[in-house]
Amino acid sequence: MDLSRHQLMLDIGGGSGAHSIRAVSVLPNLRALILDLGPICEVAQEFVTQYGLQDRIRTHVANMWNDPFPKADLHFYSNIYHDWPPERCYFLTEKSFKSLEPGGRIIIHDVLYNDEKTGPFAPAAYSMLMMGWTEGKSYSGAELSGMLKEAGFHDIQVHPAFGYFSVVTGLKP
């Protein structure tokens, strides 16, 4: 997946900023904005400073449910969707679609079931934990692709990442 044309990644629920730090380290034209709650942004800023990336990564204190998304051409969610039921995930998907300009991309990075939801074991076990601790569950690539399609995204693709993680991506036409 070629991300070289993107200039600003909004790392939604970006936590420590680990994904933003890695992304800007390998994509020289990319800047990142970590969107999270105040105390979490403070921690992320410490890591950004530790890596000397203050000129390329900023933090933005906001609540992903209630506050508007700042302008960006790439929306990135890592380990977010599994915390929420389908209707909340769709809300985020649609919010990204409305916020992105044409040509903008969404990327969802998460532990995924196979499309038949028969395995693998790790996402199934993880789903049980999520159902007990959060409102969420594990999803399949097909389920997340369906959410992206319903929201209006095109060129939807699922790519395996590391371990049981995959990325689901789509473009706003």
Features from the language model and the residues they span:
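Alpha-helical subdomain
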Residues: 3-173
